Amino acid sequence: MPVKSTKTKGGSTQGGSQAGGPSTLKVNKARVPAKGKKDDDDATEAGEHGGEEWMQTKSLIKPDDQLELNDQELKEEFTRILTANNPHAPQNIVRYSFKDCSFKQTSHVDQLAIHFSLDGNMIHKDSDEARRQQQRHGASEAISEQAISEAGEEKKEEDGEQKTEEPKEGEKRDEESTPAPAEAKSDQKLTNQFNFSERASQTYNNPYRERGTQTEPPPRANFSSTANQWEIYDAYMEDLEKQEKAKEKKAAPSKKDDDKSKKKLTALETQSDDMSRISHAAKIIERMVNQNTFDDVSQDFKYYEDMSDEFRDQEGTLLPLWKFSYDKSKRLAVTSVCWNPKYKDLFAVAHGSYDFMKQSRGMILFYTLKNPSFPEFVYPTDSGVMCIDIRPEHPYLICVGYCDGSVGVFNVTSTDANPVFQSTAKTGKHTDPVWQVAWQKDDLDNNLNFFSVSSDGRVVAWTLVKNELTYTDVIQLQLDSAPQDGPEGTQLTPLGCGTCFDFHKQTDYLFLVGTEEGKIHKCSKAYSSQFLDTFEAHHMAVYKVMWNHFHPKIFISCSADWSVKIWDHTYRNGPMFTFDLGSAVGDVAWAPYSSTVFAAVTADGKVHVFDLNLNKYEPICEQAVVQKKKTKLTHITFNPNFPIVLVGDDRGYVSSLKLSPNLRKVPKDKKGAALNHGPEAEIAKMDKLLALVREPPKDNKS
């Protein structure tokens, strides 16, 4: 008999046979001790041999060209750095920038590398799609069972009609054909819906088959017509009439109250529409009346040229044209004048007060040369407006600076007279009046931004983000004096008072800042704690600094110390030209048509026009343009297209003056032919003048 042996936990061996019997048990008992002894002997031998193998040394098998290293080389550590950069990612992607009209390299490259991606086709059993599949599967099973049952019944009917000779065999067949009683279905094991694994396999793709059919093409027709403004208008009006007739047919009869309310609403709507139409028509009629009233002035603006300039070689005149004023702004000084960069006949005027002991309201007015009698837009403000600037890319956006230290942005296209953005004490407004604001290029996120300078010693960059203004301090105008002792032993660094600034036309990061101490600081947007250079320019407050439109190194400044100075920011030995005008100079401006022509206004009511190419010492035009003696001129600006200037005074009036031919003379050669006119020619003309006044470099003696 076969013997079955098992080993217990204690190490003993038990035996047993498949068929029980005393003889069999005896045989097993006799065999057990012998087998156990043999196993013990085998274990002892295995233990001895295993110990010997453990004690024996094993020789390493290595190839002949194996590199042998000493202990120092083996202990040397190598640093392995794992990075998330994709080695196959391209490093030299170049894209075309439509904004800058040039190709630019893309610095940020996507480092994502996908090694394997598989979209699973498993769905949750409780989802809607799973329920729909179960319903479809159950319906198909029911249909198949019904078909099987119908086939069985038909077979039974046929067997009943036929006479069978062997009923027993028929009974057997019926018994065989009848299905067995369905057993109770066991509970189906449900899978864990949160623990599953996806499997994939390669299957044979079904070949594509092309099928085609012939159909009749849709009918086509050629038609042509002309489309212009009045035909489009007529078509819209016909469609509107059809819609109104359809509404009248569908409208049910209403009560008297509803009729009254509808009549009131329609009356209000028609009244508002009529007012808008009347206002537009009234504006056109007003311009027509002004054109007839000021026809002589319009003719002078367009065609008049002073013929007496032919007899005066180095002298010119200013022809007064229109005078702009508004009844509610007569007692407010003109604090800023700015031409619209898109609409050449439109300009903005800011009104405020330079008497800071009696601060009152302010006002922003928009005038046009087509209607000098009344402003186009009026924006009253609670605080005096000290400066204004219009964005070149969006001529409907105007940034302003107030006397209370806040800044704001107006949208001319909006019907609301309030600013769309305005800074508050929570958003970092200035603590002193804002003297100048200027739009700059969009930041890296394409957000609009502008800069402002104030008497609190801060130059701030304002960014328009969604519905709020965010500020960033660009630089603080710290003085060279030692820190002063503050309360509780603190040290206070005195700050200068900024009065004006101007950004370079070509170098985006470079700008100048003028102060009340008479200094001009050359600053950079990249350095917020250090000046690039400082010019000891004037003895009193600097009222204006402005870069030349053509020469990248030249800028001009004016001050309350009666002087106007022209500087080269790379020349440290002093100004290139200095002019004493005999009165406080309120504003100065370069001409947009020449690099050597500039104009300045003084507190005695005079306009001074200089052309360095004709006379380097005296103005070629000095003319009083105010009617009252005590009227002070505050600002002046050139029109970029027409030969006129705008001059504002402290009584709220803005005067337009036309330059005579001698004030905008084109340089000619010895034969009388006009020289090349362009940026390079203007730069060369200015360099020729600067070469005469620059000190020659000193030779270093070795």
Curated annotation (Swiss-Prot):
A GO molecular function held by the record: dynein heavy chain binding
Compartment annotation: Cytoplasm, Cytoskeleton, Cilium axoneme
Pfam families: WD40
Compositional bias of kind Polar residues: 189-206
Biased amino acid composition, Basic and acidic residues: 36-52, 152-176, 243-261
Region (Disordered): 1-64, 128-226, 243-272
WD repeat residue intervals: 380-420, 429-472, 490-533, 537-577, 580-620, 628-667
Annotated Gene3D superfamilies: YVTN repeat-like/Quinoprotein amine dehydrogenase
Main localization category: cytoplasm
Compositional bias per record (Low complexity), positions renumbered to this chain: 1-11
Keyword Cytoplasm: yes
One GO cellular component term noted in the UniProt record for this chain: outer dynein arm
Record keywords, A-Z: Cell projection, Cilium, Cytoplasm, Cytoskeleton, Dynein, Microtubule, Motor protein, Repeat, WD repeat
Keyword Cytoplasm set for record: yes
Cross-referenced InterPro entries: Dynein_IC, WD40/YVTN_repeat-like_dom_sf, WD40_repeat_dom_sf, WD40_rpt
Any GO BP: cilium movement
PANTHER family named among the record's database cross-references: DYNEIN AXONEMAL INTERMEDIATE CHAIN 1, DYNEIN INTERMEDIATE CHAIN
Subunit structure, as described in the record: Consists of at least two heavy chains (alpha and beta), three intermediate chains and several light chains.
Family membership noted in the UniProt record: Belongs to the dynein intermediate chain family.
Function: Microtubule-binding protein that may be involved in dynein outer arm assembly on the axoneme.
Protein name per Swiss-Prot or TrEMBL: Dynein intermediate chain 2, ciliary
Organism, scientific name: Heliocidaris crassispina (Sea urchin)
